[in-house]
């Protein structure tokens, strides 16, 4: 049934949903990567679409920015719309000098400065991790496509303008890149018994100050989307 944030009805969403942050990017993905996309959700400036890729139903819906936003949308998709897999497709800033611009990275885990997991009253810290089946499907798809995709830990920050010193402390612990959503998505998937994975394209490097041009960003975005869509095809067989 519809929620305060989603006016779709049960059955409108495929079992795999791709979630970029930007509503305009969700529209672009639907129109350029899916066959016969249909608008199924349009509330609060966030749209959701369902179409097919290689004959497999796939949905795409924006998450908005930050953990509270993706926490709401992913929880409703998992619990109200029978979605099984959510793949975050977004951008991230590299926190290591050796991580090349244009890389597509997969978040095996997501550390965070957020108190998002406090709602579960666990009495300690919780380590948000992705779903292993989704991660393996991503690794296999990247290899098949010939796309370099490092796998490791992401840093999901509650704040965009983080102090550089804090970022470097996370980098010293081997964290690959910073973004703003993965930890909440992984927590929500764990709590609801569903699957989630974040794959991100590296748009800039916080260590050396380099960044991709507009054309280069589009190329890495395409590689990320191809991987995500191939994951959906593989998961449809499970």
What are these regions (language model features)?
Residues 35-42, 146-152, 235-238:
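Flexible, glycine/charged-enriched surface loops at secondary-structure junctions
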Residues 1-128, 132-136:
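Metabolite-binding pocket within alpha/beta catalytic cores that recognizes anionic/polar moieties
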Residues 137-145, 188, 227-235:
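Generic non-transmembrane alpha-helical segments
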Residues 206-238:
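His/Asp/Glu-rich mid-to-C-terminal helical/loop segments that flank catalytic regions of hydrolases
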């Amino acid at each position: 049934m519809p929620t305060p944030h989603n006016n779709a009805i049960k059955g409108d969403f495929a079992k795999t949903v791709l979630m970029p942050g930007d509503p305009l990017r969700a529209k672009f993905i639907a129109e350029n990567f899916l066959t016969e996309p249909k608008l199924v959700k349009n509330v609060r400036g966030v749209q959701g679409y369902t179409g097919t890729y290689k004959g497999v139903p796939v949905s795409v819906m924006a998450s908005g920015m930050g953990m509270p936003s993706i926490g709401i949308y992913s929880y409703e998709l998992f619990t109200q719309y029978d979605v099984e897999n959510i793949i975050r497709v977004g951008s991230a800033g590299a926190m290591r000098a050796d991580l090349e611009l244009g890389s597509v990275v997969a978040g095996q885990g997501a550390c965070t400065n957020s108190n998002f997991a406090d709602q579960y009253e666990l009495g300690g810290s919780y380590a948000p991790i992705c779903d292993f089946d989704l991660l393996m499907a991503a690794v296999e798809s990247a290899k098949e496509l010939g796309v370099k995709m490092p796998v490791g830990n992401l840093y999901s920050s509650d704040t965009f303008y983080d102090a550089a010193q804090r970022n470097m402390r996370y980098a010293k612990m081997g964290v690959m890149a910073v973004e703003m959503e993965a930890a909440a998505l992984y927590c929500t998937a764990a709590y609801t018994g569903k699957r989630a994975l974040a794959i991100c394209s590296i748009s800039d490097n916080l260590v050396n100050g380099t960044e991709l041009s507009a054309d280069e960003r589009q190329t890495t975005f395409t590689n990320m989307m191809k991987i995500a869509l191939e994951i959906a095809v593989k998961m449809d067989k499970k």
